[in-house]
Amino acid sequence: MKKKRFYIRTGILLVLLAALGYTLYSAVFQNTESVAVGEKAPIFSLEDVDGNRLKLDELKGKGVFLNFWGTWCEPCKREFPYMANQYKVFKDKGVEIVAVNVGESNLAVRNFMKDHGVNFPVVLDKDRQVLNAYDVTPLPTTFLINPDGEIVKVVTGEMTERMIHDYMNMIKPEGSS
C-alpha cells in the first residue's frame, strides 16, 4: 500500500515538474511576437473620438510613432506632454503620432485629451484587435515605423522627452529638415 502511494505521488510530481518545465521553456525560448523589427507594420483602420477613420496605410511615406496607451496608465500620462511637444516639432517634417487607446470609452478618452492638451491623432481600439495584432502586453508600448511601413524599433515602457525626440528624428523621412 505504501509503495503504491509512493508511485502515485512520484508520478504526480513528475507531471507537475514537466508542466513547469514546459511553461518556463515556452516563456523563455519561444518567440511569441506577432510583429518584429524589420517587418511590415500590420495595417489597421480605427476611429477617433469624433468618428473619423484613420487608416495606417494612408500614412505611408511618413514616419509613424505608434503609441499604445490607457487613461489609467501613469507612465502614459507622463509621456503625453512630451509627445505633444515633439509633435509640434516633427509634424511638418513628415512624422505622425498615432496614439491607440486600448478598450476605453469615448468619454474617458475625450476627457483625457482635453485635460492633457493632446494635439495629435488618438484612435480607439475598443475590441483590442490592433493591440492583439501588435502583441502589445505592457502599456505604454511604442512602435516606430519608417516611411516604408517597416517597424524599426519597439519601445516598451515610459520614455523621456529626449528619447521621443531622438526616436521621431530616427523615423522622419529622408530629406526632411
UniProtKB/Swiss-Prot annotation:
Domain called Thioredoxin: residue spans: 35-173
GO CC annotations, alphabetized: plasma membrane
Cystine connections: 73-76
Key words, A-Z: Cell membrane, Cytochrome c-type biogenesis, Disulfide bond, Membrane, Oxidoreductase, Redox-active center, Signal-anchor, Transmembrane, Transmembrane helix
Pathway in which the depicted protein is active: Protein modification; cytochrome c assembly
GO MF terms held by the record: antioxidant activity; disulfide oxidoreductase activity
NCBIfam families: PRK03147.1 (NF002854)
Role noted for this protein: Thiol-disulfide oxidoreductase which is required in disulfide reduction during c-type cytochrome synthesis. May accept reducing equivalents from CcdA, leading to breakage of disulfide bonds in apocytochrome c; following this reduction heme can be covalently attached.
HAMAP family, A to Z: ResA
Similarity comment: family membership: Belongs to the thioredoxin family. ResA subfamily.
Protein name per Swiss-Prot or TrEMBL: Thiol-disulfide oxidoreductase ResA
Gene, per the UniProt record: resA
